[in-house]
Amino acid sequence: IVMVNVQQTLERWYAGGLLNNEALTHLRQQGEADGAKARALVDAAGLTYEFDVLFGQPGEVIARVAKEQSCIGIVMGARGLSDLDHLFLGSTAHKVIQLAEAPVTLVK
């Protein structure tokens, strides 16, 4: 099992110096906190797994990691954006479905 939490960053933040070490540390801590419940469930089941907090565009990063790790499937939550948010932000799940080579299962 490979679990990732992807903290969305924009390339222009890097270029503009807006993502300093303090900001990246905060994002990593947020990702660790966000993944705590999922890790607890997998721990309780006695399964082994890898967990990492990554940075970038979530859909692209998830699809890339799945390919690099030769995952046979992807299971991810469907956050449920409002129509307006979806229009402006897009859907991570939709992007993963488009890019991933493995089957994608969405959990509500």
Please annotate each region the language model reported.
Residues 1-17, 41-50:
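Small/aliphatic-rich secondary-structure junction motif
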Residues 5-8, 77-79, 108:
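Short secondary-structure boundary segments
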Residues 11-15, 73, 98-108:
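Intrinsically disordered or low-complexity boundary/linker segments at protein termini
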Residues 13-16, 63-64, 86-87:
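Short, well-ordered secondary-structure micro-motifs
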Residues 20-33:
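A short acidic, glycine-rich active-site loop
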Residues 30, 53-57, 79:
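Short beta->alpha linker loops
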Residues 40-74:
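Structural beta-alpha unit
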Residues 76-98:
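Glycine-rich, Arg-bearing micro-motifs that act as flexible, cationic patches
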